[in-house]
């Protein structure tokens, strides 16, 4: 029975991907299967509902309480142990739910407010330094940065991803810079206390990491930290050998100096 229901949902989903209008009258079935007692059926329904939400979030808005409730149950380890991966509860279901919530909470204070508590719980539980736990934290930060913002939640996110930035693992470091970039898009202030950890990434031998760091520092800069950041960029410029990277860095230093110069003398010295 369970396998039949799961395969039926997956088949409908495949038809939807090829010809959405053919199964538009059956969208209610995906919603119905979201409440199935078997997690594998529910998970299959989530995949379909994710695609529907990406296409048009509005019809799925009233499912926010259901998605939040399912995520809460997963985080609280209420799904069977067979769904654990490296002792993390149903990580792929968590990530799918986070992607759905990111769509539904965008520019919607009411929907987002319902999500804040469970997202905070996901951050706390996912921050266990395992690879899959890090993936969940990364996705959770992207979700928190996509929905109507909560200052408390975003501060929590910035604190968690600063550990990524300080990691010796370059993949994790890059993910941390990317996640911090999402937060900075909302308000650069959330990343200010972590700016020195970001600056340290400028000395990394990985070129893509250095480029990502320069981009983030550029967007983090304000009148109260322009001197520190531009000074570090100048140090980087002196040692850089890549022509294009030197050119890009020089351009950005000029833009920041023009925009935030604390004094005429500083501007002249910098330029």
Task: Indicate residue ranges for each PLM-predicted region.
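Extended alpha-solenoid helical-repeat scaffolds
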Residues: 1-271
């Amino acid at each position: 029975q369970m396998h039949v229901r799961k395969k039926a949902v997956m088949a409908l989903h495949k038809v939807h991907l090829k010809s959405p209008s053919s199964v538009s009258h059956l969208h209610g079935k995906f919603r119905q299967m979201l409440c199935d007692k078997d997690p594998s059926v529910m998970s299959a329904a989530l995949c379909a509902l994710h695609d529907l939400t990406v296409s048009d979030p509005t019809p799925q808005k009233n499912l926010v309480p259901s998605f939040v409730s399912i995520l809460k149950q997963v985080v609280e380890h209420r799904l069977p142990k067979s769904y654990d991966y490296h002792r993390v509860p149903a990580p792929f279901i968590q990530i799918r739910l986070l992607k759905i919530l990111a769509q539904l909470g965008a520019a919607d204070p009411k929907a987002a407010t319902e999500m804040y508590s469970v997202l905070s719980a996901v951050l706390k539980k996912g921050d266990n330094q395992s690879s899959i736990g890090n993936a969940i934290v990364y996705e959770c930060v992207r979700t928190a940065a996509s929905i109507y913002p909560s200052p408390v939640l975003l501060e929590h996110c910035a604190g968690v991803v600063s550990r990524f930035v300080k990691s010796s693992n370059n993949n994790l470091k890059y993910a941390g810079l990317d996640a911090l970039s999402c937060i900075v898009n909302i308000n650069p202030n959330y990343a200010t206390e972590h700016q020195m950890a970001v600056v340290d990434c400028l000395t990394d031998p990985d070129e893509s990491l250095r480029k990502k760091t320069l981009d983030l520092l550029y967007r983090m800069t304000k009148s109260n930290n322009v001197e520190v950041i531009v000074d570090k960029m100048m140090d980087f410029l002196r040692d850089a050998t890549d022509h294009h990277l030197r050119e890009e860095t020089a351009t950005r230093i000029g833009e920041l100096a023009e925009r935030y110069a604390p004094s005429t003398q500083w501007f002249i010295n910098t330029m």
